[in-house]
Amino acid sequence: MAKKSMIAKCNRPAKFSSREYTRCARCGRPHSVYRKFHLCRICLRELAHKGQIPGLKKASW
């Protein structure tokens, strides 16, 4: 889990637009966040396996 202070810091408007960064909407993780889903790779994988993200399924070939 992300620190509450860092999540609060991310929610404030940045002084410069280049300082803004994405965080996972579910756990607050700052790295490897998919913009389309606003989820990190770990949360995306968990929800996809449970079938909670419509239109997303695990690839198999």
From Swiss-Prot:
One record GO biological process: translation
Protein name, as recorded: Small ribosomal subunit protein uS14B
Cofactor annotation remark: Binds 1 zinc ion per subunit.
Cofactor entry: Zn(2+)
Keyword Ribonucleoprotein: yes
Family in the record: Belongs to the universal ribosomal protein uS14 family. Zinc-binding uS14 subfamily.
Species whose genome carries this gene: Limosilactobacillus reuteri (strain DSM 20016)
Summary of the function given for this chain in its UniProt record: Binds 16S rRNA, required for the assembly of 30S particles and may also be responsible for determining the conformation of the 16S rRNA at the A site.
Amino acids binding Zn(2+): C24, C27, C40, C43
HAMAP family named in the record: Ribosomal_uS14_2_B
GO molecular function: rRNA binding; structural constituent of ribosome; zinc ion binding
One of the record's GO cellular component terms: small ribosomal subunit
Pfam families: Ribosomal_S14
Description of how the protein assembles with itself and partners: Part of the 30S ribosomal subunit. Contacts proteins S3 and S10.
Keywords: Metal-binding, Ribonucleoprotein, Ribosomal protein, RNA-binding, rRNA-binding, Zinc
Disulfide bridge partners, by residue number: none
